[in-house]
Amino acid sequence: MGRSKSFGVIVLTILLLVTAAVNAAEKPFVEIDIYSVNDFHGHLRAEAADPGMAALAGAVSELMKQNPEGALLVGAGDMFSGTIDANEYQGQPVVIAMNKMGFAANAAGNHIFDYPLEIIKKQAAAAEFPLLGANILTAAGDKVAEPFRPYTMLQKQGLTIGIIGLTTLETRDKASQTNLQKVKILPPEEVAQSYIDELRNKGAQIIVLLTHIGSSQGEKTAVEGEIIPLLQKIQGVDAVITGHSHLCVSGEYNKIPIVQAGCYGEAVGRIHLLYSRADKRVVAAGARVYKLDQLPKVQDAAMEKLLAPIFKDIDARYNAVLALNDQLLTNDRNGESRVGDYFMDLLKSGFKADAALYNGGAVRADLPAGTVTMRDLIKIFPFDSTIYVGEVQGSDLRQVLEHGIGNPNISRLRFAGLQVTADTGEPEGQRISRILLADGSVLADEKYYKVVSNDFMFSGGDGFASLKNAQNLRACGKANTFFAFALRSFKTINYPAADDRLQIKN
């Protein structure tokens, strides 16, 4: 009698599963919701304006309950690095947290190459989702570089969804040049259409571009940015997820929904697709961004428990006080940065250089008033570059300033030891009208100057190609090691609110 009852339960279960599958297949319309996070940059813990991963996980979980059978979650790149919590463990805490949230895929961003390829392979091995980068090839250019995959295919509501991963061509300039040596970044348009066609031939009914490619949008304007020229050259895409520009975008191009969800876990993107089985295509679509501060706050307790030991370990090692700061020093990546000025002054004096230079994108946070800890320092300089000293000709130094000041494509150059007058309304090559050294002398194009900077800049990163001409380069250790030593030595920071190192006419 017991066996008969068990057999009956098994048969009933099978019938229910079959019936559910049939019902799903018979639905004339299917709703698919693709939720996305981009440019998280390792902001795992809640502090200041950052919601933290527990809040992000809670918000995503609640949103996905609206369509549990038809929802999926993806990442649009630059997830694994950018804070001490992530960097100290080579991105693994973010990977583990994303596993717990159930990410279905993650596109490779330019900052994936903050890590060497060997570390990226370890991240991919730990991830329960594929790391996508269809335009990231081996150095020989013969195939997609491991551990990246060009696309993934998955099933939702009886539909086959193909997701293609693409990264910005700006990765060539906005990533560690050393770590890029083993790969070749192709223009996305050179590979996108072939993979779209391949997925269609394999039966994909919905195709999504999961990209770390920039987009932007005014309050009432169409979507713009790097993603649009790509979309003008391809066809057959149903949805586009973007990243890289750290903006909230929800719009469309040629009726293709496009989304981007800010940065640091502040928001979640959503693309809603309505698929018609009769028409065998997406017949309606929309894009939306949910800001976490506008949603009911739901903390994921399991995520908090998962991350607590990591935070405890980091705090124990990096909360020691380095110095006391008299006043807040702010950082505007596209404008003035007294933080950048202060640390460039430390570099110039510490290495007895004529000038100190730093790419503005490497300076990421304010320096708070009061106690300054190693955690604070790493928030400012999360990528911990290597310091280099070299001899740079005046004409090349002038070109660095022309490229780094008033350039809308990169964060403003940080420097010390120079007094510069610039007209940012002029094109590159005509912006700088005066450059004085600390002794009041005018920069001489033919003369060589002692310059201290970082490995990223001396290797031509961010387009600072003229620095590749530097002579007698020598490595001088990690930047954060030097900065921490300097702060401990001075013990107090009393830095003026402004100076005249940069005078802008326009």
Where are these predicted regions, by residue range?
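A glycine-rich phosphate-binding loop feature that marks nucleotide/adenosyl-phosphate handling sites
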Residues: R288-K291, L324-L329, L357-L367, F415-E426, ...
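Bacterial N-terminal signal peptides that target proteins for export
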Residues: M1-V11
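A hydrophobic, small-residue-rich beta->alpha segment in the mid-to-C-terminal subdomain
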Residues: L443-S489
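Acidic, metal/ion-coordinating pockets
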Residues: A24-K312, N334-S349, A356, T371, ...
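Glycine-rich phosphate/diphosphate-binding loops and the adjacent beta-loop-alpha structural elements
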Residues: R317-E336
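Bacterial N-terminal signal peptides
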Residues: I10-T19
